[in-house]
């Protein structure tokens, strides 16, 4: 697949959210995860969006951005290209999402669609939260 974005499950893109899959200089796209930068050797590459990510209206997602599961992005400008898991990103900075608030929102979201947020998935995210808090 030549020009791809990778989107997880239960993602909510606010109206007008956009993503670029080509740099203005036609250079190869680099992707950053945590403190590590990867050379993709690709000219066309969109973004990587984890499960349960939410963006606000009009979010502009840059080429090669990585948004971790459970993150929420609210920004009038281009957000960071690397937003860690379970993180709220606003124009004033980043903060960790409280796990109980995240779990409650997952239950609400899935209930709207007649689906359960089951104990296995809940425990997965609780364990993930503990891992990233260390």
What are these model-predicted stretches?
Residues 1-133:
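Glycine-rich hexapeptide-repeat left-handed beta-helix
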């Amino acid at each position: 697949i030549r020009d791809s974005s990778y989107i997880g499950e239960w993602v909510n893109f606010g109206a007008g959210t956009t993503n670029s899959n080509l740099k203005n200089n036609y250079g190869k796209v680099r992707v950053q995860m945590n403190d590590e930068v990867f050379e993709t050797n690709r000219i066309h590459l969109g973004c990587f969006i984890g499960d349960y990510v939410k963006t606000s209206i009009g979010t502009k997602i840059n080429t090669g951005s990585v948004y971790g599961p459970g993150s929420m992005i609210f920004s009038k400008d281009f957000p960071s290209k690397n937003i860690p898991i379970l993180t709220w990103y606003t124009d004033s900075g980043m903060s960790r999402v409280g796990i109980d608030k995240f779990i409650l929102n997952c239950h609400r979201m899935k209930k709207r669609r007649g689906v359960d947020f089951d104990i296995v998935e809940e425990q997965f995210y609780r364990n993930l939260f503990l891992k990233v808090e260390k």
